[in-house]
Amino acid sequence: MSISQPVIPPASSSPVRAVLLDADGVLQLIGTPWGEALTRGGGPAFAQAMIDGETDALAGRETLTELLERVVKDLGLELRASDLLEMWHRATPDPVAWQLVRDLREAGYTTVLATNQQWERRAWMREQLGYDGLCDIDG
């Protein structure tokens, strides 16, 4: 018994013209839930401070490294921001999802990587995971 692949109708036959995709949990797998990973990395206060303070880093008003350095200093942690940054370098592309993106593009849909990422993580995803060229629009 074989499992057939779903057929993606041509974009010309659908009112849908574009598909927006997130990274974490959609195009890539991160394993450990984020709150748990942050708690393991620096403790509960660190996890909460990172979640509470992440908005500026996601908006590009502060780098992730600057946020990490500030939180480590404010909490008096004996951790290095550069070591903590490695937590943001954990993700594995989901090959099934990436194939779906290629299939959508082949069927004529515009694909958009619509994800909130800090600059450091975005660069890592592009350089190490190969996101450049996956979607039609990724900015």
Predicted regions and their residues:
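Short alpha-helical
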Residues: 33, 92-95, 120
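A metal-dependent, Asp-based hydrolase signature
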Residues: 55-85
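Short, acidic loop-to-helix structural element flanking the phosphoryl-transfer center
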Residues: 82-112
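Short, well-ordered alpha-helix to beta-strand connector turns
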Residues: 16, 108, 135-137
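Generic structural signal for small/hydrophobic residues in well-ordered secondary structure
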Residues: 22-25, 60, 113, 138
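Cofactor-binding loop segments of dinucleotide-utilizing enzymes, especially the Rossmann-like FAD-
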Residues: 116
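Substrate-recognition "cap/lid" segment bordering the active-site pocket of phosphatases
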Residues: 119-139
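Active-site neighborhood of HAD-like aspartate-dependent phosphohydrolases
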Residues: 2-55, 70, 74-77
